[in-house]
Amino acid sequence: MNYKQNEKINQVKESTLVVGIDIGSTKQYARAFDWRGIELGKVFTFSNSREGFEAFKAWMQHLQDKYKKSDVIVGIEPTGHYWFDLGAYLEDEGILLVMVNPYAVKQTKELDDNSQSKNDRKDPKVIAKLVTEGRYSAQYTPDGVYADLRIMVANRKRLIREMTQIKNRFARWFAIYFPEYTDVFGDYEAQSSMLLLKKVCTPEAIVELGAEKINQIWRDAKLRAVGMKRATTLCETAKRSIGLKKGSSAARYEMKLLLEDYEYKKAQLDAVMEEIEKLCRKIPESEQMLAIKGIGVITVAGFLAEVGDVRRFESPRQIQKLAGLSLRENSSGKHKGQTTISKRGRSNLRAVLFNAAIPLIATNPEFKSLHEYYTTRANNPLKKKQSVIAISCKLIRVFYAILANGVTYDPQKLLSDIHRQPQAA
């Protein structure tokens, strides 16, 4: 599939049947047009099932035979996950599926009737119109290790979100029943703290158990970081606690549930991380990516999950656009506004790169030097956040070179931006 717009337009010929689909959770609505935008047939509704997909294919074949169309392009506005099964079916059947940008659909739908209304008949026509104008992108569904990585990275993200919810529930519990607990244990997730919370958690229960027995719990578990001093401090703090005493029995049960949820989700997260590491090892070039100081498995896995096989891209600039890191100028007439990033692309990929750039600047000598150069150079110095974006784009080029060309990471080549400036002067 070609990516230049003129080439996309040329792929829609007089012999092409253009079909736009409005994707839904249970039903899809399709409309067919020729290359000039003239509608062929009526709206076709089909269910999100094999029978529905086969009926849709038969409907398209009927229109192809009736209007003498030799090929077909199906355009959709990707809506959540509802298009995945249809996309896989069309791919298996050898039918070309392309994507139109939801933002473009929103902006274009008012042209026909000067109304921002949305309905199942209107959207397929707008989608098909965008396809005939070449305003679409080719469908890409990762397969093999890249598909597995995308799923596992999404699972990790979900588990982290659920762990955050559990930690917020812990914070609420302590704020109500034992606000002073975190003064004694700076980190309630410490092994000594979690072990104690399984035995006792409310201030009155801690006082009743006593410092000796608390210390014995830690000694039996062979924990050396805590001892009698910490146990005594905890008991004294519990005696003076302002925590709520009403409902203490239910509070203890709530803590039991919290601990069970925490351990279960933590075990799941550890297992997912283990799988992610295994998947990364299946991609030989990932070792070179991990050899860069400051780059970890999370960054490598996140990048590969979002981008897939980089060899499908002609240049790293296309990945930069995919991440929504392309520069956007805000100018009109004599006014020249600030240049910003487009933010039109995969937000997860953008987050992976941005979150990787910050520790790189802090720990990697080459990237740190590059950041200092960007922010202090005499000609067009960047603000710190702008420099982080520039570092993110530089990281894309480094990863692309490693994955597409199989080269090793060269710190001196990375610093060429700095070395080039004196030569130009």
For each feature predicted by the language model, list its residue ranges:
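A detector of single, family-specific signature residues
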Residues: 1-425
